Amino acid sequence: MSQESNDDSLGIDKLSVDYDYLLYKIADYVSSIEFQTNQICKRQNELITKDIVNGIVDENIKHFREILTKCEKLENYFDMLDQINMITENFKTRLAQVARDYKELQKP
């Protein structure tokens, strides 16, 4: 009987080795899946973060362009004011000349 237990007639030792090997393969497979899942999640996170950052950057660029457009319009308004100032200065000079001419005509 002791020899039968040494011979492992029921195959318990082999079953134990097979079981351990199966657990090892399962753990290895789970680790592989975990690694791939982590890589995919990291990549997705990078894409989302990058897209969010890019979206924010794109939105900021859009706002800066709008501000730049407003600044250009403002600059045009100042140019118009300068032109109006030149016209009014010229008009004042001409009006003063007309007033002098009128006074000359009024003299007897």
From Swiss-Prot:
Compartment(s): Cytoplasm
GO biological process, one term: endosome organization
Keyword Chaperone annotated: no
Alphabetical UniProt keywords: Cytoplasm, Transport
Chief location: cytoplasm
Keyword Plastid: no
Domain of life from the UniProt record: Eukaryota
Gene Ontology CC: BLOC-1 complex; cytoplasm
Matches recorded under CDD domains: BLOC1_CNL1
Assembly information from the UniProt record: Component of the biogenesis of lysosome-related organelles complex-1 (BLOC-1).
Family statement: Belongs to the BLOC1S4 family.
Entries under PANTHER family matching the protein: BIOGENESIS OF LYSOSOME-RELATED ORGANELLES COMPLEX 1 SUBUNIT CNL1
Function: Component of the biogenesis of lysosome-related organelles complex-1 (BLOC-1), a complex that is involved in endosomal cargo sorting.
Protein name per Swiss-Prot or TrEMBL: Biogenesis of lysosome-related organelles complex 1 subunit CNL1
Organism: Zygosaccharomyces rouxii (strain ATCC 2623 / CBS 732 / NBRC 1130 / NCYC 568 / NRRL Y-229)
Gene: CLN1
